Amino acid sequence: MQRKTVWCVGILLTCATLFSPQPSLSAPTPEPVPESQPITQPLRLEIRLKQRRVNVYQGDRKVKSYAIAVGKPGWETPIGNYTIKQKIRNPEWIHPLNGEKVPGGDPENPLGRYWIGFWTDGKNWIGFHGTPNPESVGTAASHGCIRMYNRDVEELFGKVSLGTEVVVKN
C-alpha cells in the first residue's frame, strides 16, 4: 500500500507542476517605475560689489553666499554679465604691471590654488581666486579680481562649470 501511495503522490506532484501556470504564460509583472529625478537648474553667480559678497543661485533660490574682496580704486571689478571661461588648479600668476611670474602651487602665489576666470580683454584676466592674505577678504584690495578664502574658492571651483553665468552688480 505504501508503494501505491508514494507512486500516486509522485504522479499528483508531476501533474500539478505540468498544469500550473508558467511564469512566461502568466500575467506580466509590472516593472517598477523609477522615481523621477528633480531637474537641476544651472547655477548663476551674482557678485555684489558694495556688499563684498558673491551669491550662488540655482534658479531663483540662493543656495550659498561667500565673502569676497573686489578691485581696489583704479582697478575696479567691471560691472556686467559674463560666463566662466577658465577653471585652473594651481594657476601661475603674472604680475599685471611688471610681468613677474609666480608659479602655481607656490605659497606666495596671490591666486592661491584655484582660478575661475570670467573676464578677459585678450591679454589680462579677471576671475575668482584664493589668497595667501585672508585678511584682505571683505575689502577692495585686488587688481579687479574676486578674492575669496581658499576653502571657499575650492568649494566654488567644484560647483561651477565652464559657461556658468556670472553677473557683477554694484
Predicted regions span which residues?
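Bacterial N-terminal signal peptides
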Residues: 9-19
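Exported/periplasmic cell-wall-interacting domains
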Residues: 28-29, 36, 40, 72, ...
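Cell wall/extracellular polymer interaction/catalysis modules
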Residues: 2-8, 21-91, 105, 111-115
